């Protein structure tokens, strides 16, 4: 076989799941832009393209690395433009080609190739003649075994004289796998190609023979089943004549007796009886028997009328809740209110609560305690990442592998119709093409509808009105409004330092001492150690990391006791770093003296309150306002509003009225790596600017927070408790707050307000008078 090798450049059309051989004539659709551009280029020149198969058919935008190196040079015989911005082309394979380099990849692939054109073959070569005979013989045997080969293809093989064409035509009709086709396309040497083709045909022939054996075996089994069905029907008739009962009949009777005890309404009872009747009439080998059995078992296992006896002793419930959790007053109060009303009114529906707060504050664990206090069975449903509506409502019975939703599953697990069901992480559900689980929960959490909750699988209404639902969330922002409307929201703020100390003393240390195999006598610590762990090793709203650090401390103590044969280890603030390593955080520090342009603000973070030092600097310039410290858009707008307020009051404040033309103001909030935003720093930035412009110092023992308007009003802010605690932590006792936040301060615990002086202001002028020294 003579092969002429020529080099040329040619545009490429990438193919998905298709390998084209020389001498093949076929049509396919071209829709990708990269292919349409290559097609356009080819039609403008010699109407020839290189067809390269993709290694991964799923790749939408292939790169050169995603294409095979060998392909087929093809001539475009016809092109038809379709309405959907695609073109249907008819191509004829001409010759093999190997890509030796990419000339360009945009807007289409243009490659340099070595093209291999075959020119006849030496048919006098005995080895070649033998290979051709073997391939043709194997092909004819394969064609007799299968109906896949079209008759015209079989006929054309007998008339082909060119050995290369013969190999390619047979390969195109016999080989199924894309990788095998590509392997043959890459065989430039004719003898090697025929040898490999012969191996692949034999393998395909073997697969066909195995398929035939499987078909015959399955047919025999079907015949056997039909015979068995006929005999069983005869046996049924004989048993009926003799008055005997078969196994399905007795099984159906057993199901009827069990269903009768469930206390279902007559309408629902008839629905279940229909399924039992179907089971009775089915042939013993029917696949539907398993489906009906599973359904009936679900119906029987559900607690239709089973209740746990609820505790309605308000003092007992209060003691249990206090025993398990410190603080969480709002949640406990709401449960005690429910108990009080429940005692006065027997048919009270279960409340639907939503506990919202940062991680680690005890939302999930308080739910478990509530269940224990009320003597209700407890079941937790994790909703985080849920995106399929069927997870809530269940799948319809018609689907293969259908199962009930999580609500019904939880009820079967609880074994009572009045459990406490915790819907954990309700804010982390999402939706996709399978539906919106949040919408499915609307019926579940609506006390006016959930007395007849209908699961798609069970199809019988179930009364959820006696279930106590408690949902947990970290934020309300991602909960859809209609769903949020059905929830009674109880916000759980982060714990104060005092609360964390009490929790550590009462619960965390005793628990970790026990879990790490220690005795109380083997470890000594005082309150100062707990405060140091809270301040320097954890920075969170909850106590999850605090418990981790205490656990680490106990493990180190256990290790030291065993290694050094000690009877007792004393932990102090001095040796704490030995057990927990270097401090992870530093304590907020108080500004020690009155300074010009430096003001202490108060900020809220997910980890609690923080003091925020705001610095202002004035320098000659052109009125530019520079803001640094990674401030968000809201803070930047507050700074601009502050400048306008000061301009309007410049004369009263004793400031040069042209300061906005002659001076540049630079405001910086330290710890620039941390993003900061929110409107509550408005009064702080305004005070810092006035101090810097008037050259008057700001009192270092005053902290402030509040949003400002252009008219100078001070608006209320959130996170009051956390901000006051932050001021208290650094030793600041004077706090300026918006007047409308007075009610929030009144609700705070006494220990938070102790030794603190609160000044409530309505206007920014009051802030300037209090904070700036004359």
UniProtKB/Swiss-Prot annotation:
Residues involved in ATP binding: 357-364
Induction trigger: By heat shock.
GO MF annotation list: ATP binding; ATP hydrolysis activity; ATP-dependent peptidase activity; sequence-specific DNA binding; serine-type endopeptidase activity
Enzyme Commission code: 3.4.21.53
Active site per the UniProt annotation: 680, 723
InterPro entries noted in UniProt: AAA+_ATPase (IPR003593), ATPase_AAA_core (IPR003959), Lon_bac (IPR027543), Lon_bac/euk-typ (IPR004815), Lon_lid (IPR054594), Lon_proteolytic (IPR008269), Lon_Prtase (IPR027065), Lon_prtase_N (IPR003111)
Alphabetical list of SUPFAM superfamilies matching this protein: P-loop containing nucleoside triphosphate hydrolases, PUA domain-like, Ribosomal protein S5 domain 2-like
Keyword set, alphabetical order: ATP-binding, Cytoplasm, Hydrolase, Nucleotide-binding, Protease, Serine protease, Stress response
Domain Lon proteolytic as annotated: residue spans: 593-774
BP-aspect Gene Ontology terms: cellular response to heat; protein quality control for misfolded or incompletely synthesized proteins
Domain Lon N-terminal intervals: 10-205
Catalytic activity: Hydrolysis of proteins in presence of ATP
Cell location: Cytoplasm
Name by which UniProt lists this protein: Lon protease
The species this protein was found in: Caldicellulosiruptor saccharolyticus (strain ATCC 43494 / DSM 8903 / Tp8T 6331)
Lineage: Bacteria, Bacillati, Bacillota, Bacillota incertae sedis, Caldicellulosiruptorales
């Amino acid at each position: 076989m003579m092969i002429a090798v020529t080099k040329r450049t040619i545009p490429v059309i990438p193919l998905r799941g298709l390998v084209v051989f020389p001498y093949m004539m076929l049509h396919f659709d071209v829709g990708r832009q990269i292919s349409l551009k290559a097609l356009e280029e080819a039609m403008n020149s010699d109407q020839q393209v290189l067809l390269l198969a993709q290694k991964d058919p799923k790749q939408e935008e292939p790169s050169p690395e995603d294409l095979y190196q060998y392909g087929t040079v093809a001539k475009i015989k016809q092109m038809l433009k379709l309405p959907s911005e695609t073109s249907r082309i008819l191509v004829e394979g001409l010759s093999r080609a190997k890509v030796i380099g990419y000339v360009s990849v945009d807007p289409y692939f243009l490659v340099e190739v070595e093209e291999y054109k075959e020119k006849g073959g030496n048919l006098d070569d005995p080895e070649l003649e033998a290979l051709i005979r073997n391939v043709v013989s194997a092909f004819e045997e394969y064609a007799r075994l299968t109906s896949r080969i079209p008759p015209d293809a079989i006929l054309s093989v007998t008339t082909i004289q060119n050995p290369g064409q013969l190999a390619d035509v047979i390969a195109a009709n016999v080989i199924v796998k894309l990788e095998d086709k590509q392997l043959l396309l890459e065989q430039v040497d004719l003898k090697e190609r025929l040898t490999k083709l012969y191996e692949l045909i034999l393998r395909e022939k073997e697969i066909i023979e195995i398929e035939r054996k499987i078909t015959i075996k399955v047919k025999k089994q079907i015949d056997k089943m039909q015979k068995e069905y006929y005999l069983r029907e005869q046996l049924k008739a004989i048993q009926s004549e003799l008055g005997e009962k078969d196994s399905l009949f007795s099984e159906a009777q057993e199901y009827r007796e069990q269903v009768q005890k469930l206390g279902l309404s007559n309408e629902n009872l008839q629905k279940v009886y229909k399924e039992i009747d179907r089971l009775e009439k089915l042939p013993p080998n029917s696949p539907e028997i398993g489906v009906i059995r599973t359904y009936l078992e679900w119906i029987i296992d559900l607690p239709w009328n089973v209740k746990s006896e609820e505790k309605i002793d308000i003092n007992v419930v209060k003691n249990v809740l206090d025993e398990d959790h410190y603080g969480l007053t709002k949640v406990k109060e709401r449960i005690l209110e429910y108990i009080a009303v429940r005692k006065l009114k027997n048919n009270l529906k279960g409340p639907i609560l939503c506990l919202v707060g940062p991680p680690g504050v005890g939302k999930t664990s308080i739910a478990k305690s509530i269940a224990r206090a009320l003597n209700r069975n407890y079941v937790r449903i994790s909703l985080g990442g849920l995106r399929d509506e069927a997870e809530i409502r269940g799948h319809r019975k018609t689907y293969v592998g259908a199962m009930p939703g999580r609500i019904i599953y939880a009820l079967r697990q609880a074994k009572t119709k009045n459990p406490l069901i915790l819907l954990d992480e309700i804010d982390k559900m999402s939706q996709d093409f399978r539906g919106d689980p949040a919408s499915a929960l609307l019926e579940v959490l609506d006390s006016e509808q959930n007395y007849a909750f209908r699961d798609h699988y069970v199809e019988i209404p179930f009364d959820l009105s006696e279930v106590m639902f408690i949902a947990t969330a970290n934020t309300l922002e991602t909960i859809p409004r209609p769903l949020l409307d059905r929830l009674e929201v109880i916000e759980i703020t982060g714990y104060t330092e005092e609360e964390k100390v009490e929790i550590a003393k009462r619960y965390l240390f005793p628990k970790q001492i026990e879990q790490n195999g220690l005795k109380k006598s083997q470890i000594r610590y005082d309150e100062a150690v707990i405060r140091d762990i809270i301040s320097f090793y954890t920075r969170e709203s909850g106590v999850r990391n605090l418990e981790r650090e205490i656990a680490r401390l106990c493990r180190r103590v256990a290790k030291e006791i065993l290694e050094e044969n000690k009877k007792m280890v004393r932990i102090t603030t001095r040796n704490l770093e030995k057990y927990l390593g270097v401090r992870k955080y530093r304590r907020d520090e108080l500004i020690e003296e009155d300074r010009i342009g430096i003001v202490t603000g108060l900020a809220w973070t997910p980890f609690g309150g923080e003091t925020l030092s705001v610095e202002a600097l004035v320098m000659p310039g052109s009125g530019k306002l520079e803001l640094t410290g990674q401030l968000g858009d809201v803070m930047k707008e507050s700074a601009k509003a502050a400048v306008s307020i000061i301009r309007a009051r410049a004369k009263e404040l004793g400031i040069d009225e042209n300061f906005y033309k002659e001076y540049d103001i630079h405001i910086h909030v330290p710890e620039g790596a941390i993003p900061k935003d929110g409107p509550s720093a408005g009064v702080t930035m305004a005070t810092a600017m006035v101090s810097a412009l008037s050259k008057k110092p700001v009192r270092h023992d005053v902290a402030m927070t509040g949003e400002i308007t252009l008219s100078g009003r001070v608006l209320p802010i959130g996170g009051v408790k956390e901000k006051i605690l932050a001021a208290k932590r650094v030793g600041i006792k004077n706090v300026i707050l918006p007047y409308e936040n007075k009610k929030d301060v009144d609700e705070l615990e006494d220990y938070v307000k102790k030794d603190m002086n609160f000044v409530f202001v309505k206007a920014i002028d009051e802030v300037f008078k209090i904070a700036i020294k004359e």
